[in-house]
């Protein structure tokens, strides 16, 4: 199409033999000495007047109809290009609208469920209840009207892929404000927490992996191919430059007009959010060898902290106030971290779609999956409580790190069931556990001789939740379905377990 538009109507290409035959077909019946003759042999046209040296021949079109025909072709090509551009724009608008509507419904459902549970004084994760409701609806539709279940899955697929694409970002705020969270924790307690986190991750990995192997040997279920899981699209250069522009403009604006949006937290929100997103985009594009020691989440958190440090220095306010504006925990005056963590509920709701997609896999390997997840979750909670007591860690800190192997969204819900906990420490410990798993899980699994994809997937997700899952599945896609299921079920079962008052009391008794 572009070539058509770029080629002139009268061009040297018209002098080709094929083109000459086409142009003169109406008038040539014979030739003699360069003359074109009619059927009766009379001279019609002398071509010698139009002859040019080789390489410079230029044969004028002999018919105005042919000229009009080629002009029409060019106009049609231009019309086609315009139509193509319009259709592309229309598709993009429809896709964006689809994403906004589907994601908006999930966020709205999460918000109203939270409000309802708070109003009813229900101490149970509202997002988990919503996840069960969505999964139940999908299962009912699948048994009665399968087309309706597929239609529902297709409708929410853009929102699901959006959540998967940006999932690590929702974990970052706890790392960004870590300097404020650990300020009151003694250094000796910090060392003990690090020991529990690192050793606990390794122990949970072993328990989940070897449990899965033992159950697989008993049930002897053959592994079959799972449903393919869609992968989010990579980041584009346009996204990088767009967020860079937002950062520069909002940073300068906040520097000269610190309360232009009403409060300092709102004014700081655009540049702190864009710096976080930029760090993640840049970190995701790093070579795999660098990602092993410099995970995208670390790059993301470091980018936000450096932006806060630069703004604190330039404005003279210092680092702490800017970090305080990053995560305010005030609904009426949110910061960038509050916006990101506001998606955590939608992460839990999205578990319903991933579980439904892999329902056949869950049914086939139910024994391995559920046994490993239950044993690993119970071990993780009670071993953390016991080791915390043995090393002399403060009870409030021990309780805060109990759900170290459970995804942030549900870990925060779990610690909210206990009194006197540090939720910022909880989130930070969960993220650090995931980072340890992301960096070392493949090497450790190989050392432990856990070769089975099911065991590797379950062990990774049960010990290092989403971050470990992403790291392993990037190189071992066959383990991804088992990672996704174990990742969701570990959080679900841990939340259900800690929602039982007797279990909470037993954990507190172990903690001392």
UniProtKB/Swiss-Prot annotation:
InterPro entries: CidB/LrgB
Tissue: Expressed in leaves, stems and flowers, but not in roots.
Family recorded in the similarity comment: Belongs to the CidB/LrgB family.
GO function terms (MF aspect): glycerate transmembrane transporter activity; glycolate transmembrane transporter activity
Protein's name according to its UniProt entry: Plastidal glycolate/glycerate translocator 1, chloroplastic
Function of the protein: Glycolate/glycerate transporter required for photorespiration.
Record membrane topology: Multi-pass membrane protein
The UniProt record lists the keyword Heme: no
Annotated compartments: Plastid, Chloroplast membrane
One annotated Gene Ontology cellular component of this protein: chloroplast
GO biological process, alphabetically ordered: cellular response to water deprivation; chloroplast organization; glycerate transmembrane transport; glycolate transmembrane transport; lateral root development; photorespiration; response to abscisic acid; stomatal movement
Coiled-coil segments: none
N-acetylalanine carried by residues: 77
Native organism: Arabidopsis thaliana (Mouse-ear cress)
Keywords from the UniProt entry: Acetylation, Chloroplast, Membrane, Photorespiration, Plastid, Transit peptide, Transmembrane, Transmembrane helix, Transport
Phenotype of gene-disrupted mutants: Interveinal chlorotic and premature necrotic leaves. Bleached leaf phenotype when grown under ambient air, but normal growth under CO(2)-enriched air.
Transmembrane segments: 93-113, 127-147, 160-180, 195-215, 238-258, 270-290, 293-313, 336-356, 367-387, 398-418, 425-445, 480-500
Pfam families: LrgB
Segment annotated as transit peptide: 1-76
Upper taxonomic lineage: Eukaryota, Viridiplantae, Streptophyta, Embryophyta, Tracheophyta
